[in-house]
């Protein structure tokens, strides 16, 4: 049985963590990005399918390439963030299943059903995006996930000629708490959950 994490760790990961809109002028190293991935990759996915593919946009040239796809409300904070992660999903993720899930012929589950493959890739890449957020928090970084962007423009700019499709964007860095909005409410257990 696993041990519960400390109350301090719970605050870091959940109750005191915030979505950030402003950033300190502190770089995020490539080594730190590797650490983030090396933590998040252990999060579970269906049949270990691991469909997420990530582009860490961290150069001025990369940000300019991303700029046309951003909504007006997300433009300034994304250009200012040290890193923006494009979380994409590989539409042919199943080609890696003989390596990732050697217990059976999982590849055939998806080659025989394109709809199932797409649903699985999209759902599980979204789960992996959440793991990335928690990996960042565990390493002392802050995040700002976003869906306010033009997916087609991102795909054309970054993934033309590949099997990748964008899912969401996550700004990563060291947040400026002076620019954090007031804490918003969450649904109660009674509003969000049922017991059967």
UniProtKB/Swiss-Prot annotation:
InterPro entries: Nitroreductase (IPR029479), Nitroreductase-like (IPR000415), Nitroreductase_HadB/RutE (IPR050461), RutE-like (IPR023936). The keyword Flavoprotein applies. It holds the Pfam family Nitroreductase. Gene3D superfamilies: NADH Oxidase. It is an enzyme of class 1 (oxidoreductase). HAMAP family: Oxidoreductase_RutE_HadB. This is Probable malonic semialdehyde reductase RutE. It comes from Enterobacter sp. (strain 638). The gene is rutE.
């Amino acid at each position: 049985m696993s041990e519960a994490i400390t109350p301090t760790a719970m605050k870091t990961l959940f109750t005191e963590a915030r979505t950030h809109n402003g950033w300190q002028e502190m770089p995020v190293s490539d080594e730190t990005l590797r650490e983030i991935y090396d933590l998040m990759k252990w999060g579970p996915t269906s049949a270990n399918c691991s469909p997420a593919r990530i582009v860490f946009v961290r150069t001025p040239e990369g940000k300019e390439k991303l700029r046309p796809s951003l909504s007006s409300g997300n433009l300034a904070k994304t250009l200012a963030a040290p890193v923006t992660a494009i979380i994409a999903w590989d539409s042919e993720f199943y080609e890696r299943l003989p390596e990732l899930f050697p217990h059976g012929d999982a590849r055939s589950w998806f080659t025989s059903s394109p709809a199932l493959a797409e649903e699985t890739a999209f759902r599980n890449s979204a789960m992996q995006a959440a793991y990335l957020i928690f990996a960042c928090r565990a390493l002392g970084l802050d995040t700002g996930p976003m869906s306010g962007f033009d997916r087609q423009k991102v795909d054309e700019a970054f993934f033309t000629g590949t099997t990748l499709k964008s899912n969401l964007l996550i700004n990563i860095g060291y947040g400026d708490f002076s620019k954090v909005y007031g804490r918003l409410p969450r649904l109660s257990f009674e509003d969000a959950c049922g017991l059967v």
